[in-house]
Swiss-Prot record:
It comes from Saccharomyces cerevisiae (strain ATCC 204508 / S288c) (Baker's yeast). GO terms for biological process: DNA replication, synthesis of primer; mitochondrial genome maintenance; mitochondrial transcription. It is found in: Mitochondrion. GO terms for molecular function: DNA-directed RNA polymerase activity; mitochondrial promoter sequence-specific DNA binding. This is DNA-directed RNA polymerase, mitochondrial.
Length: 1351
């Protein structure tokens, strides 16, 4: 069959531009006489086929298809557009006026709402409504170029819903849609992929002779080449590609995507005759068999649940003893909270099935015997875990270790999938199990077993949810000609109905119950939660479940026929799946609107409130007999908080007692555990980290502005070095230190307080209350004592629960190879995505972690290991040789600590960081047993810490020689102690003051120590306030002064002297700090020239919109996110809630912008230094980890890392970064203006008054500042015009702003002529930032020879 010919027809039509209303997604038409009518010229359109077309098959002719092949010339331009994140869409806040930014974000909000509704309708098979939504999306002007992706989503769903729809009719439908409904939209390669997939499914009974011409025709129509069609693996399955290559032979291996080509080349799939191609029904059967647990129909009952082979049913108990992951280690006595039970359930994803054990036993190595020395069978009852770390270390050769790691990586892929995607069914099954057991015993006392209660709630809530879903489906399936006749409930159902029908009702019940229980004591209200937080949390949890299911379902479909089990082939499949997942997660840009989340959450919570009851008992006041009854478990009401009326959900005290008031459980999520395989590398801003959960490079909270800049930088390739550094952090493999864990678990299970671990305490013991007629001072003292005890009890319980989490996770990962994926905060600082257990945690967390890979100590490694122990004991300001001597003088203590950590002298507990010291003692003790210590294989991370790293950056920025010396940038024989130096300066100041008779100085002068000032010196550089510093110092003085008020008074006095001493020592640093603060203040109070009247209140009071933005040396754009919040009102079943609107363009918070810039700028520099160092260490083959300004590697690699740290710091500061920042600010905020004050009596003021009077006459009204900005904007446009005539006109224009252009020192002008509020008048001044402070003489290159820069 020949390719259809093209005729060129140019049609001109009058189209009325239809816009999206700012109030929502309703479409409105301009009036007929509106100027919005525009002319559109269409490109060539296919109207027929070549007369020479053949009819090869005798059935299919070229006249039958493909008629939709129109506008071919411009088709390429359309396919490069991908769906964007909500915050990316048409929003550049610094290239548009305030009004256009608001309009753009309004349209973005509308598009996002339409997108999410389109997706929901398609998933619910509401095809007619989906098509009407497509028509609305088509009418958004800015969205036209990306509209084909929306249409493709619709077309794909249409194909799936009716796989038997004839291909020729499918072709006619596509042609009609693109020619009639969406005239100026071009198909792309994904459209062709959908048609090919449909053709393969429809022609399941057609011979290859009939099918081949159809496929060939579509392939010839490719826009960007055939490979682009086959890259759509979310449409074309491996089976499809196998048929096209091996059966129809219409493609060659070279035309396949790189990710799947090795699979199809190395695998001959089970021959699939063309007349037996699996249709959609068959696909559904396969999916039901393989993933029944995750991909059930939405009306499936709980009894139909099947457990995937990778995830044996593990029951999560919410009362009593919870099943714990089997490990060859002592079980931990858990804090009895629902949070702890949830996390234990999650960790069961690490357990091994008999099939997996059998798979491990078949690992092949060069060793004679199987390394596991086990022959598990499917009936094996031995549940002891396998210690992969011990296996790895037992292998004698490097080759065997590499082979083991390769096999382990393939093996762990499936385990990682289970770990990230543990569903809700296990919880539901456990509730059912406990209920039936209690029923069998005749014991339904819900006070004894919370699970029984939860199962009753679940069973009573499930019919209500199903009934609501049926109502929604019924309403959505009706043809509603007039929505005005609907009541309010049904009108709301039309909005949230398509979303509510997406998830299995049983799952929604479980998620609702778990979310509310997890929100207990974390919802912002004592014994309850804020309603707004509750409804949003439940709605978002439902959405996340849907997203997770979609990724798994797509992967299951694409790879459904791949079942070959050789390790080599599995590796190819895992690689292909990884690429596929990345693609799918990147494409998942649709977010449900907050209003939909709120409504879904409120519907489900209101149903739970209706059925959730708790048993209560009381005493009859007459008979004094005990009586029993039921009370609601949750109650909705209102309370006042800080003067505001809040809607709250209160939890009954009976339920509170069972939940034990746990505080941290809300954040326990299976996706947030360490990983068993290497994280997905960061290659763009929205793809990296976990494999099945989307993460973004920056942790942002509803800040489209940040994301817009980040996306632009990523697309331009500006932040590749940031990705390089993050990927090195993520690729570092870890494991749990078994010896430290055994000691911690012994301490934990005793329940006694030990070091920073508080003891177990079930009840709060309060002192007896004094008589009511006691002296007020006695009552006040008692209340303060009670408050202190209550706060400590709450804090200790919180800390104990947090420790419990860490230990449970550590226990589950014993013997495992684990990784920590990282991303960044908005300043560029790196943090692990797994929050509960990582190397950024407390001392215990760090002591529990060691590197998976070991390295020989070598000549210098032993020295650095000894230095490391000395540092952990707080002797980090001694010369290196003295630190080594400290360790060598305590060899017997080290031996005793390692061999008798709890029964010996416990010397290790006297360290500043005891758990890390114990880990180092264990390692050093093993080293001392060896004949040649240099041969010892070390796994212990050794740290190199900066000396008040923020001050190091400030000293380098300001060229401050004295400051640089105090923070070890200058070479010296011994390390400088900046904290001790500041303490000496403060003491000298107090001694002078005491001599002059200052009583406070007399009392304090002998009490100033390094410890008193350390925290304040450390945080001063990061912008600590006077009040904050006062409390820091008060904490250090509290052991000296018993009276709290006295301690606070002395602290206020002392803080002034500490601040003055720091400023004296780091003079240049403080000048830079002042310059940063002043620059931020001016920027946040500035106005763009293209701002319009809508951004002014009464014409003279503008909303200040300018965030402070800068670019780090690594190209990462930093946007300070401090803006005023705007709230949106949403009516729900429970109450009207106010939710944040992420698409609103709000004024900046000028105070926070100013206060934030100095610390944030320094943070962005230390983050840049870390990422540069990480990338370079990765290139040199080092295992590298970082805790902000503390860098870790193997002892033997410390010397190499130290060279890298110094070279990268020099590389960073060889450029004058303050001057670079000033130049960036000048360019970024060029032509901005600010409001200033002038005395009316000055000559300049009189000139401005005359100009304003002249403008007023022309305008026929009073002139506003908005008018003055408008005319200055016109002047700038004329000056920048390419036409000389325009430029001449611009040069002759005089505006109120142009009068100040020749005045060089505007600051002096304002200072001299400003006047007060009454005598001054407001004027517009050009924004000019202050000149940067002069730079000192310090040469940063000298730190190459400073051995104490990091040590």
């Amino acid at each position: 069959m020949l390719r259809p010919a093209y005729k060129s027809l140019v049609k001109t039509s009058l189209l009325q531009r239809r816009l999206i209303s700012s109030k929502g997604s309703k479409l409105f038409k301009p009036s007929p006489d509106s100027t919005s009518t525009i002319l559109i010229s269409e490109d060539p359109l296919v109207t027929g086929s070549s007369p020479t077309s053949s009819t090869t098959s005798g059935i299919i002719s070229s006249n039958d298809f493909p008629l939709f092949n129109k506008n071919r010339k411009d088709a390429k331009s359309s396919i490069s557009y991908q769906w964007k994140n909500p915050s990316e869409l048409e929003f550049d806040p610094f290239n548009k006026s305030h009004a256009s930014a608001v309009t753009s974000m309004t349209r973005t909000r509308d598009v996002m709402q339409l997108w999410s509704l389109l997706e929901a309708c398609l998933q619910s098979n509401l095809m007619k409504r989906a098509f009407s939504i497509l028509e609305s999306l088509y009418l958004v002007p800015e969205h036209k170029q990306r509209f084909i992706e929306d249409y493709n989503m619709y077309l794909n769903s249409f194909s799936k819903n009716d796989p038997n729809f004839p291909i020729l009719k499918m072709n006619e439908k596509l042609t009609n849609d693109l020619e009639t409904s969406f005239k100026d939209v071009n198909y792309n390669d994904k459209t062709l992929a959908i048609m090919i997939h449909h053709a393969l499914n429809f022609h399941s009974t057609t011979s290859s002779m009939l099918l081949k011409p159809i496929i060939s025709a579509y392939l010839k129509m490719s826009v960007n080449g055939i490979r682009e069609i086959f890259s759509c693996l979310d449409i074309l399955t491996i089976s499809d590609l196998n048929i096209l290559m091996n059966d129809l032979k219409v493609i060659t291996p070279s035309q396949l995507p790189n990710s799947v080509r090795p699979i199809l080349e190395s695998l001959t799939l089970s021959p699939t005759p063309v007349n037996n191609i699996e249709n959609e029904e068959g696909l559904n059967k396969v999916e039901a068999e393989n993933d029944s647990k995750l991909h059930k129909a939405s009306n499936a009952s709980s009894d139909s649940i099947k457990k995937p082979s990778l995830d044996p049913l593990r029951e999560v108990s919410f009362h009593g003893s919870t099943e714990v992951l089997s490990k060859d280690a002592e079980k931990l006595i858990a804090v009895d909270t629902i949070g702890m039970r949830v996390i234990r359930h999650t960790l069961l994803g690490l357990s091994l099935t008999p099939e997996q054990k059998e798979q491990i036993s078949k690992f092949k190595f060069d060793a004679n015997d199987n390394v596991l020395k086990m022959k598990p069978t499917k009936n094996d009852d031995n549940n002891n875990s396998i210690n992969f770390f011990e296996i790895y270390n037992s292998l004698p050769t490097l080759e065997e270790k590499k082979a083991f790691e390769s096999a382990l990586n393939i093996f762990n892929q499936d385990r990682q999938k289970v770990l990230e995607n543990r569903a809700t069914e296990a919880a539901r099954e456990r509730w059912k199990h406990d209920f039936e057991e209690a029923k069998a015993r005749g014991d339904i006392s819900i006070e004894k077993n919370l699970n029984v209660k939860l199962w009753k709630w679940y069973n009573e809530m499930l019919p209500l949810v199903k009934e609501e879903i049926n109502h929604c489906r019924s309403l959505l399936s009706e043809k509603l000609s007039d929505k005005k006749g609907l009541n309010k409930v049904d009108t709301n159902r039309l909005g949230y109905g398509p979303y509510l029908t997406l998830i299995d009702p049983g799952k929604m019940c479980v998620i609702t119950i778990l979310e509310l229980l997890k929100l207990n004591s974390t919802g912002g209200v004592i014994e309850g939660m804020r309603t707004a937080r509750a409804v949003i949390s439940v709605g978002k949890a439902i959405e996340m479940e849907f997203r997770s299911e979609q990724v798994l379902k797509s992967e299951s479909q694409a790879f459904r026929d791949v079942n070959k089990k050789s390790p080599e082939f599995k590796k190819l499949v895992q690689n292909a799946k990884s690429v596929f997942r990345s693609s799918q997660i990147e494409q998942s840009k649709i977010l449900w609107p907050q209003s939909i989340r709120a409504r879904i959450g409120s519907v489900l919570i209101s149903m739970l409130i209706q059925v959730a009851k708790v048993s209560v008992q009381g005493v009859d006041p007459v008979t004094k007999a005990k009586v029993h009854g039921e009370a609601p478990a949750f109650a909705h009401g209102y309370q006042y908080h800080n003067g505001s009326k809040l809607g709250v959900l209160k939890i009954h005290k009976t339920l509170i007692r069972q939940l034990n008031g746990e505080r941290l459980i809300a954040s326990v999520q299976p996706q947030l555990l360490p990983m068993l395989v290497e994280p997905k590398p960061w290659v763009n801003w929205r793809s990296g980290g976990y494999h099945y959960t989307q993460s973004t490079l920056l942790r942002t909270k509803d800040s489209p502005e940040q994301v817009a800049y980040l996306k632009a930088a990523s697309d331009n390739g500006d932040i590749d070095r940031v990705y390089d550094g993050l990927n090195v952090l993520g690729r570092t493999p870890w494991t749990v230190n078994r010896k430290v864990f055994d000691v911690v678990s012994q301490v934990w299970n005793k329940g006694e307080g030990f070091l920073d671990i508080p003891g177990a305490q079930d009840e709060m013991v309060l002192p007896p209350a004094p008589p009511k007629n006691s002296d007020p001072s006695i009552l006040r003292a008692w209340k303060l004592q009670v408050k202190t005890i209550a706060n400590k009890f709450s804090s200790d319980r919180s800390n104990r629960c947090d420790t419990n989490y860490k230990l449970e996770i550590a226990r589950a990962f014993l013997g495992e190879k684990l990784y920590f994926p990282h991303n960044l905060d908005f300043r560029g600082r790196a943090y692990p995505l797994s929050p509960h257990f990582n190397h950024l945690g407390n001392d215990m967390s760090r002591g529990l972690l060691i590197f998976w890979h070991g390295k020989k100590l070598g000549p210098s490694g032993l020295k650095w290991l000894k230095i490391h122990l000395s540092n952990l004991f707080g002797f980090d300001k001694l010369p290196l040789k003295d630190r080594v001597a400290f360790t060598e003088s305590h060899l017997q203590d080290i031996k005793d600590s390692a061999e008798n950590p709890l029964t010996g002298d416990r010397w290790w507990t006297t360290a500043d960081k005891p758990w890390q010291a114990l880990a180092t003692c264990f390692e050093l003790n093993e080293v001392m047993k060896m004949d040649n210590p240099e041969e010892f294989i070390s796994h212990q991370p050794v740290h190199q810490d900066g000396t008040c790293n923020g001050l190091q950056h400030y000293a380098a920025l300001g060229g401050d020689v004295e400051g640089a010396t105090q923070v070890n940038l200058v070479p010296s024989d011994k390390p400088q102690d900046v904290y001790a130096h500041v303490a000496r300066l403060v003491q000298k100041r107090l001694e002078i003051a005491a001599e002059k008779g200052d009583e406070n100085a007399k009392i304090l002068k002998d009490k100033i120590t390094r410890k008193v000032v350390k925290q304040t010196v450390m945080t001063n550089v990061y912008g600590v306030t006077y009040v904050g510093a006062t409390f820091q110092i008060a904490k250090q003085l509290s052991p000296i002064f018993d009276d709290r008020k006295e301690s606070l008074d002395f602290s206020k006095y002392l803080t002034k002297h500490v601040f003055s001493a720091i400023r004296e020592l780091f003079h240049s640093a403080h000048l830079i700090q002042d310059w940063l603060g002043e620059s931020a203040k001016r920027i946040s109070k500035s106005i763009r020239l293209d701002v319009d009247e809508k951004s002014f209140k009464n014409g003279n009071k503008p909303d200040f919109m300018s965030s402070v933005i800068w670019t780090t040396p690594l190209g990462l754009p930093i946007v300070q996110p401090y803006r005023e919040e705007s709230k949106k009102q949403v009516e729900t079943n429970l109450q009207t809630v106010f939710i944040s609107d992420p698409f609103a363009v709000n004024p900046v918070n000028a105070r926070r912008q100013k206060a934030g810039l100095p610390p944030n700028f320094i943070h962005s520099l230390d983050a840049s230094h870390m990422l540069l160092s990480a990338a370079e260490c990765g290139k040199q083959g080092l295992d590298f980890a970082s805790v902000h300004d503390s860098y870790w590697t193997h002892a033997s690699d410390i010397d190499t890392m130290n060279v890298v740290l110094r070279e990268q710091f020099i590389k960073l500061h060889e450029v004058d970064l303050v001057l670079r920042l000033k130049e960036e600010f000048d360019q970024r905020y060029k032509n901005y203006v600010k409001i200033g004050k002038l005395k009316r009596s000055t000559d300049l003021a009189q000139k401005i008054i005359r100009i304003r009077k002249d403008l007023s006459r022309k305008l026929g009204r009073s002139t506003t500042l908005a008018d003055e900005i408008y005319f200055e904007k016109k002047r700038q446009e004329l000056l920048n015009s390419p036409l000389i005539e325009d430029r001449n006109v611009g040069e002759k224009m005089v505006t109120t702003v142009s009068l100040f252009e020749d005045i060089t020192d505007l600051d002096a002008l304002e200072l001299e002529n400003g006047g007060d509020e009454n005598s001054g008048m407001s004027v517009l001044l050009p924004l000019r930032l202050p000149e940067i402070p002069p730079k000192g003489d310090f040469d940063v290159t000298v730190l190459r020879n400073s051995q104490y820069f990091f040590s």
